[in-house]
UniProtKB/Swiss-Prot annotation:
Location of the region described as Disordered in the Swiss-Prot/TrEMBL record: 288-319, 357-430, 479-605
Protein's name in the database: Synaptonemal complex protein 4
Locations listed in the record: Chromosome
Keywords: Chromosome, Coiled coil, Meiosis, Phosphoprotein
The keyword Phosphoprotein is annotated on this UniProt entry: yes
GO CC terms in record: central element; chromosome; condensed nuclear chromosome; synaptonemal complex
Gene null: resulting phenotype: High levels of embryonic lethality and a high percentage of males among the surviving progeny. Failure to localize syp-1 and syp-3, components of the synaptonemal complex central region, to chromosomes. Failure to form chromosome synapses and lack of synaptonemal complex formation leading to a delay in meiotic progression. Impaired stabilization of homologous pairing interactions. Lack of chiasmata formation during diakinesis. Reduced crossover frequency. Increased rad-51 foci during pachytene indicating impaired DNA double-strand break (DSB) repair progression. Elevated germ cell apoptosis.
This protein's encoding gene: syp-4
Location (main, coarse): nucleus
Organism: Caenorhabditis elegans
Ranges annotated as biased composition (Basic and acidic residues): 395-404
Length: 605
């Protein structure tokens, strides 16, 4: 019995195959040496068959693996060949695209060549045409120049002939007349526009005035008349002062002193220079002399004060008065448009404009100084001398606020009273104390002697602009006894719209202050109980209370020219007058049971 065989491969490295070859060799040796029996041979043959089959399987796997390796190499070769073919195809496509572009460029170049040829031909034709046109223009220019020269010669001859023609002179005269007429027409048109604006303004004013009551219109007319009457003398005095200042300035200019500035504005420098020339002790002596002469001239001044409505202040050479001249003139011209503002407007105006009523002693003092010497300038504080620029700003501010309307009654009730001469006395800081004591004694004696005689009210509520220093001086020198209470007004009001109707007297039995222009609508005199009412003896006493005792009317129709006094007698004194607009209908005075006391109403609506 033979065993299976197995082919030996060269360079065998598989351990199973090597063991199989070794086992076959040993099995063959055993059989050859008869060292194994039959059963052992059969079992060994089965084992060798199985082992040989496994080795053959290994051989088959190795062959399959070798074939797969060969196929992989072939695949790699195919891949490389495919990649090479792709690259070759792309290169071929790129070459084809480049060849196509080259062909297009050739076509474009050929087309450009043809276009350049056409342009060259067109340029040649254009140059030929341009040369032809240039020759034509040159010929035309020559012809035009020749024709122009001929026309110039002909025009010169025509103008020469026209200059000698009369029609040309007539035409020029007509053109001049036409120009003058156009200017006249333009002026008339402007005048027409101005008149139309004036008409519209007056219509609006008349429409507004037509809504007012007759009584209010009469009151305003009288107020405006009195304001005009009081401002005109001041305007005249200001003009005279201005002329005096101009004359003095001309004299100083001739003498080589200070003069007006280049802008012809009234500067304070020439006035201040004149003040500096005099010694301050000499000023004090002159003021003492002028004030001590009041006793001798008091009767004459009293008669002068009684014969006029108000006494104007002396034209002191204060630069502020020079600046106030256009303000006063403007107020006088525009007085017809003054409207009585409300209380809030008056409170806004009060810090800017101060109404300074004049007392009896200040009136006498001013008259004495006017009779003694009117050319002595009032001394100025050193702050004004050192700050002319601030004073010029004050002048401009005063001019800006001058055209504001104000109600004399409201301002008279709200603003504290102060005399401008007393302010001047406060400014005389360098006057010796002995002179001050002498002046105070003389003024006290003079006021006690002349108080029963001088009954004139303040001089038309002089409107003067004062700075902060003067306002402070006024508050320091104000007399506490003259502050108005609820049932008493100032005793020297020349222009008082006393709507309260209460005038403060010296005692309960005396009458109220005698106002030259007192709209005393209720006519209640001094005293809170209203029992002793002197009433008003003003020029326009609308309710006919002319100063008699116990509030009785005198029946004097001259003091009530408008006939407003329908109720001459206030029962029990001090009651509501007829011109009271008392819509609640009580109509009872202060002493009756229904009124409940003295009437202190304004217009009792």
């Amino acid at each position: 019995m033979s065993f299976p065989t197995l082919q030996v491969r060269p360079n065998e490295k598989n351990p199973k195959v090597l063991r199989c070859h070794e086992f076959l060799r040993q099995s063959n040796q055993l059989v050859e040496r008869n060292m194994i029996n039959t059963e052992g041979r059969k079992m060994l043959a089965k084992l060798l068959t199985k082992m040989v089959s496994e080795a053959k399987g290994i051989y088959a796997l190795d062959e399959r693996r070798a074939e797969l390796a060969k196929s992989g190499k072939l695949q790699e070769k195919l891949k490389s060949a495919y990649q090479t073919s792709l690259t070759v195809m792309e290169d071929r496509l790129h070459i084809a695209e480049l060849s196509r572009q080259v062909q297009e460029k050739k076509l474009t170049v050929q087309q450009k060549y043809y276009e350049c040829d056409d342009l060259r031909k067109s340029v040649q034709e254009t140059n030929t045409e341009a040369r032809r046109v240039q020759e034509i223009n040159e010929q035309r220019l020559v012809d035009t120049t020749r024709a122009t020269e001929e026309l110039i010669v002909k025009s010169a001859s025509i103008l020469k002939n026209l200059e000698n023609s009369s029609d040309v002179h007539k035409l020029r005269a007509m053109e001049e007349e036409k120009r003058i007429l156009e200017e006249v027409v333009e002026g008339l048109r402007d005048q027409k526009k101005c008149l139309a604006d004036d008409i519209r303004t007056k219509k609006a004013t008349l429409k507004a005035e037509s809504k007012k009551s007759f009584e209010k219109t009469v009151i305003e007319c009288a107020k405006h008349y009195k304001l005009h009457q009081s401002l005109m003398p001041k305007l005249d005095k200001s003009k005279r002062s201005l002329e005096t200042l101009k004359d003095e300035e001309e004299n100083r200019r001739i003498c080589g002193s200070l003069s007006l500035d280049e802008t012809m504005q009234f500067d304070r420098s020439f006035i201040l220079a004149s003040m500096d020339k005099t010694n301050k002790p000499e000023k004090a002596v002159q003021q003492l002399t002028s004030k001590s002469s009041e006793v001798s001239i008091t009767p004459q001044i009293s008669e002068t004060a009684k014969s006029s409505f108000s006494k104007e202040p002396i034209p002191t050479q204060h630069p502020m008065e020079v600046g106030e001249e256009p303000v006063i003139e403007h107020s006088a011209e525009e007085s017809v448009h003054i409207e009585p503002p409300n209380v809030t407007e008056i409170r806004e105006v009060v810090p800017q404009i101060t109404i300074q009523p004049t007392r009896q002693d200040s009136v006498v003092q001013r008259d004495a100084e006017e009779l003694d010497t009117s050319a002595v300038p009032s001394p100025q504080p050193e702050s004004i001398l050192d700050e002319p620029e601030e004073e010029e700003e004050e002048l401009s501010n005063h001019e800006n606020h001058a055209d504001q309307s104000m109600d004399v009654m409201e301002v008279d009730q709200e603003v504290p009273e102060e005399s401008p001469m007393e302010v001047g006395e406060q400014e005389e800081i360098e006057q010796p104390s002995v002179f001050k004591d002498i002046l105070a004694t003389e003024q006290a004696a003079l006021s006690q002697e002349q108080e029963p005689e001088i009954v004139e009210k303040q001089a038309d509520n002089d409107v003067q602009f004062v700075d902060d220093q003067q306002v402070g001086a006024q508050l320091d020198v104000e007399d506490e006894e003259e502050v108005m209470s609820e049932n008493g007004s100032n005793k020297s009001n020349n222009f008082s719209f006393n709507f309260f109707g209460n005038s403060k007297g010296t005692s309960a039995g005396e009458g109220g202050g005698e106002g030259n222009f007192d709209f005393n609508f209720d006519g209640i005199g001094a005293g809170d109980d209203g029992s002793n009412n002197g009433g008003s003896t003003g020029d326009l006493d609308f309710l006919n209370y002319d100063g008699e005792d116990e509030g009785k009317g005198s029946g004097n129709t001259q003091s009530d020219p408008f006939g407003f006094a329908s109720n001459g007698n206030a029962a029990g004194g001090g009651g509501d007058g007829s011109f009271n607009f008392n819509f609640d209908g009580d109509g009872e005075g202060g002493a009756t049971s229904g009124a409940g006391g003295n009437s202190t109403s304004f217009f009792n609506f």
